[in-house]
C-alpha cells in the first residue's frame, strides 16, 4: 500500500518532489520546515519548497523570504532559481556561474551593474538578453557584436544614436530594422541601399520628402507606395504611371488633396 499524500488530495498536479517521489505525511514530518506547516506556513500541493512545481516553490518563498538565503545551493535548479528571486543581494554572486541558465536568468535580473558586466558573455542567449536589457549603456556597446541577433537588436534599441550606423550593416534583418528606426542623418541615406524592402520602406518613411527620388524607382512596390504617401507633387506625377495600381492610386489621392488645398487657399 502506497504512502498517503500529505494533503490527502488528488489534484491535477500531484505533490511530488524534484526526484519524482510523492510528498507524504512522513516526508512532511521529517522536513526541516515541519514547524511551519504546524502554524499554517506551508501546505503540500500548494506552498512547498520540496515540491517539483515551480509555482508552489514560489508561494513558499514569497511567504518566507528570510529562508531563501539558506536554499541557494539546493540540488534542484528551480529551488535555486526561485530562492535567488527572493534572497539578499549579497548572497547572489556565487550563482552568477550556476550550471543552470534558469538560475542565472534570475541573477541577471537582480545583481548590481558592477557585477552584471561580468555576465555579458554568459553561454546562454536568454541570460545575455536579460543582461542587454539591464546593463548600463557604457557597457552595452560590446554586446552589439553578440553572436545572437536578439541581443544585438536590444543593443540597437538602447544604444545612443551615434553608435547605431555600424549596426546598419548587421547580417540580421531585425537588427537593421531597429537601427533604421532610430538612426539619424547622414547615416539615414544608407537605408536606401539595404537589400531588404522592409528597411527601404523605413527609408521612404523617414528621409526628407525632397530626397525620395531614388526610392520612387525602387524595385519593391511597397517602397514606392510609401514614397507616394510623402513625395512632393513633381515626383507624384511620375508615380501616376507606376505599374502597380496601389501606387498609382496613392499618388493620385495625394495630388487630389494637394489640388484641393490650393483651391481652398485661393478661394
Task: Give the location of each predicted region.
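Aromatic-anchored, glycine/proline-accented short structural segments
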Residues: 155-193
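N-terminal alpha-helical scaffold/docking segments in eukaryotic complex subunits
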Residues: 1-93, 97-101, 221, 225-267
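Conserved beta-strand positions that form and line the central face of beta-propeller blades
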Residues: 190, 214, 238
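Alpha-helix capping and inter-helical loop/turn segments
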Residues: 57-66, 85-91, 110-115, 134-139, ...
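Structural detector for tandem alpha-solenoid helical repeats, activating at a conserved register
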Residues: 78, 90-91, 102, 106, ...
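Short coil turns that connect the paired helices of HEAT/ARM alpha-solenoid repeats
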Residues: 70-78, 97-102, 121-126, 145-150, ...
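A generic tandem-repeat structural signature
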Residues: 85, 89-161, 165-169
Amino acid at each position: 500500500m502506497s504512502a498517503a499524500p500529505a494533503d490527502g488530495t488528488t489534484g491535477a498536479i500531484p505533490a511530488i518532489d524534484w526526484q519524482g517521489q510523492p510528498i507524504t505525511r512522513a516526508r512532511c514530518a521529517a522536513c526541516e520546515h515541519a514547524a511551519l506547516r504546524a502554524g499554517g506556513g506551508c501546505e503540500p500541493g500548494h506552498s512547498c519548497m520540496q515540491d517539483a512545481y515551480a509555482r508552489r516553490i514560489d508561494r513558499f518563498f514569497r511567504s518566507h523570504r528570510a529562508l531563501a538565503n539558506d536554499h541557494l545551493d539546493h540540488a534542484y535548479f528551480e529551488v535555486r532559481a526561485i530562492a535567488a528571486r527572493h534572497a539578499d543581494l549579497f548572497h547572489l554572486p556565487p550563482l552568477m556561474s550556476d550550471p543552470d541558465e534558469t538560475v542565472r536568468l534570475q541573477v541577471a535580473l537582480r545583481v548590481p551593474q558592477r557585477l552584471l558586466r561580468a555576465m555579458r558573455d554568459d553561454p546562454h542567449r536568454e541570460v545575455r538578453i536579460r543582461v542587454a536589457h539591464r546593463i548600463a549603456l557604457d557597457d552595452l556597446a560590446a554586446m552589439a557584436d553578440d553572436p545572437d541577433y536578439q541581443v544585438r537588436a536590444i543593443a540597437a534599441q538602447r544604444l545612443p544614436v551615434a553608435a547605431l550606423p555600424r549596426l546598419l550593416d548587421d547580417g540580421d534583418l531585425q537588427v537593421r530594422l531597429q537601427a533604421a528606426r532610430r538612426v539619424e542623418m547622414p547615416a539615414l541615406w544608407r537605408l536606401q541601399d539595404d537589400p531588404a524592402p522592409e528597411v527601404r520602406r523605413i527609408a521612404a518613411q523617414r528621409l526628407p520628402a525632397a530626397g525620395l527620388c531614388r526610392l520612387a524607382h525602387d524595385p519593391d512596390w511597397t517602397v514606392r507606395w510609401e514614397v507616394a504617401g510623402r513625395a512632393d507633387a513633381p515626383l507624384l506625377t511620375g508615380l501616376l504611371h507606376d505599374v502597380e495600381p496601389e501606387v498609382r492610386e496613392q499618388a493620385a489621392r495625394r495630388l487630389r488633396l494637394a489640388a484641393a488645398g490650393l483651391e481652398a487657399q485661393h478661394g
